[in-house]
Regions:
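Extended recognition/assembly regions associated with phosphoester-bond processing machinery
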Residues: 1-292
């Protein structure tokens, strides 16, 4: 928020699942605010600021865009009217999220796995959000992605977990002949333990592309060092494949940094160009020293 106040036209913040009163009250964020600003801190004002944050940002050049958000895919939202609207900056209220309508209208969007279709039937609905998690979770803020391409294309762990098949179908359905949504950059799904995703975030300097062609679920138990040894060091900057999903790491000064033992902060630098094939993403890593 301090960065946004200092440069409002250049800093854009997307709302994540923690920017919510329920999460803030349960996980100590309200206590942190009171500790910094006193017992009479205006919590209502802070919550209202959360309400004004967009849950997704489409960043692009006019014909090519990336979906930038905290969580994952939201099949109930159709961005085509927003992307086709005039002007460099435009906004749209989410309105009703038509997840069930989308699933029923798109046969085959989950591939051939009957288990994935069962998850969709159980968890997808048409609804108007009242909060980020009621009556259902907003996918842009909560949903996740699989790490490997050979696991079920839809699952549920805390929220829906999307594989490459439905992810790329949703991106294609969000596109038109004139405008393409090419991929996703996000920063969710972190853990205080070195599981498959956190190990890859640490091994790759804080920016990781899902569904690597040289990996499958048999590599899920690899350590950080094993990942570094078995993987060719990515280019920096890297090209952005169509339909790719990129996860950014979390701050080291957190339970995640303590639990996973990393001491660097990371950012992704996105370089746009007139043609999407020339877009690049760079990893910026800064070592951080602090007392634990």
């Amino acid at each position: 928020l301090r960065l946004k106040m200092a440069s409002p036209a250049q800093v854009h913040i997307a709302r994540g699942n923690h920017e919510d009163f329920d999460m803030a009250s349960r996980y100590g964020f309200l206590d942190e605010v009171r500790g910094k600003y006193g017992e009479n801190a205006n919590l209502t004002k802070l919550m209202r600021a959360y309400d004004l944050l967009p849950v997704v940002v489409y960043l692009g050049t006019g014909k090519d865009f990336l979906q930038v958000n905290h969580g994952g895919m939201e099949p109930g939202y159709d961005p085509r009217a927003l992307l086709a609207a005039p002007g460099n900056a435009r906004f749209q209220l989410l309105g009703e999220l038509k997840q069930k309508t989308y699933a029923q209208a798109k046969p085959g969007w989950l591939g051939e796995d009957p288990g994935a279709r069962e998850w969709a039937a159980e968890h997808l609905a048409d609804f108007i959000p009242e909060t980020p998690s009621t009556p259902r979770m907003i996918g842009f803020m909560w949903n996740d992605f699989t790490i490997f391409p050979d696991v079920p294309q839809l699952g549920y762990w805390r929220s829906l977990v999307f594989g490459p098949v439905p992810t790329r179908r949703i991106l294609a359905d969000a596109s038109t002949e004139q405008i393409r949504v090419r991929g996703v950059i996000r920063a969710h799904q972190h853990s205080a333990q070195l599981g498959p995703l956190m190990s890859r975030l640490v091994a790759n300097g804080g920016v990781y592309r899902h569904w690597q062609t040289h990996e499958d679920s048999s590599h899920g138990g690899q350590s950080v060092e094993e990942i570094r040894k078995s993987s060719r060091k990515p280019e920096n900057p890297q090209p952005i494949p169509d339909g790719s999903v990129w996860t950014l790491n979390v701050s080291p000064d957190s339970v995640y940094g303590t639990g996973c033992g990393f001491d660097f902060a990371a950012a992704a630098v996105l370089s746009l160009a007139p043609e999407f094939k020339d877009w690049r993403i760079s990893t910026l890593t800064v070592n951080v020293k602090f007392g634990r």
